[in-house]
C-alpha cells in the first residue's frame, strides 16, 4: 500500500500540510512522503479544491520473519494454501493540516477506518480480460503496439503456491506480474 485517499465531507484547498502527520496501516507506522488534493482515484488535482486528499507512503522495510510488520493487505493462509485478503485493514491518520474551502484557517484532522473493502488496484486494471476455463481462473491484457504495428505475446503461467482462487488480483499482486505490463 503506497497511497491512502481520504474523503472529506466538504472540499479542502490544495494547502495540505503533512509534516506532523502520523499514519499507520495494519498497525505499522508509515512515513508520509507527499500529500495533495486529488480525485477519488488518488490522481492529483492541480489548482483546485477537492473533497479528497491523497497521502503517499513509503514502503516499510520488508521483514520475512514478521509478515505482519510489512503492512500488506493479504496473507498466506496455511489451512487453504492460498493467499487471501485480510478481514480488516485499519488505516489511522493523525494531525493532517487542511484548509476548508471558503476558510482561511487551517485545522488538524484525524481519522481511523477499516479500508479493506475500499481497495484501489490500478496496477491490475490493465488485465481487463478475465475469465475461467474449468476451475482455472485467468487474466490477460492487450499489449501496446510494438514497432511496425506488431505485438509479441508474453504468456505468464501463474503457478506459485497460493496463486489460485477466484480473485485474480491476488495472484497478479502476489508475484508482481503487473510489472511486465
Model regions: which residues?
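Divalent metal-dependent phosphoesterase catalytic cores across multiple superfamilies
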Residues: 139-142, 155, 164-171
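Extracellular/periplasmic catalytic domains that process cell-envelope and extracellular macromolecules
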Residues: 47, 147-151, 172-176
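Non-catalytic beta-sheet/beta-sandwich ligand-binding modules that flank or precede catalytic cores
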Residues: 1-136
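A short loop-to-beta-strand scaffold at the N-terminal edge of the catalytic core in hydrolase folds
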Residues: 131-147, 154
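Short, solvent-exposed loop/turn and secondary-structure capping segments
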Residues: 66-68, 150, 165-170
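Active-site machinery of serine-nucleophile hydrolases
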Residues: 161-181
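Short beta-strand element of the alpha/beta-hydrolase
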Residues: 150-161
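Short, solvent-exposed loop/turn elements at domain surfaces
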Residues: 14-17, 148, 163-167
Amino acid at each position: 500500500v503506497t497511497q491512502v485517499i481520504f474523503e472529506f465531507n466538504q472540499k479542502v484547498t490544495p494547502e495540505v500540510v503533512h509534516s506532523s502527520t502520523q499514519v499507520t496501516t495494519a498497525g505499522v507506522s508509515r512515513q508520509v512522503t507527499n500529500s495533495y488534493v486529488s480525485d477519488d482515484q488518488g490522481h492529483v488535482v492541480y489548482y483546485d479544491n477537492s473533497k479528497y486528499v491523497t497521502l503517499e507512503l513509503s514502503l516499510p522495510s520488508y521483514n520475512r520473519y514478521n509478515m505482519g510488520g510489512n503492512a500488506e493487505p493479504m496473507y498466506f493462509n496455511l489451512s487453504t494454501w492460498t493467499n487471501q485478503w485480510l478481514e480488516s485493514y485499519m488505516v489511522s491518520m493523525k494531525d493532517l493540516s487542511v484548509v476548508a474551502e471558503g476558510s482561511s484557517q487551517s485545522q488538524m484532522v484525524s481519522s481511523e477506518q477499516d479500508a479493506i473493502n475500499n481497495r484501489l488496484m490500478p496496477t491490475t486494471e490493465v488485465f481487463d480480460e478475465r475469465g475461467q476455463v474449468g476451475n482455472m481462473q485467468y487474466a490477460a491484457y492487450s499489449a501496446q503496439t510494438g514497432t511496425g504495428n506488431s505485438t509479441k505475446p508474453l504468456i505468464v503461467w501463474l503457478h506459485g503456491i497460493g496463486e489460485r482462487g477466484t480473485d485474480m488480483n491476488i495472484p497478479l499482486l502476489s508475484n508482481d506480474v503487473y510489472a511486465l505490463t
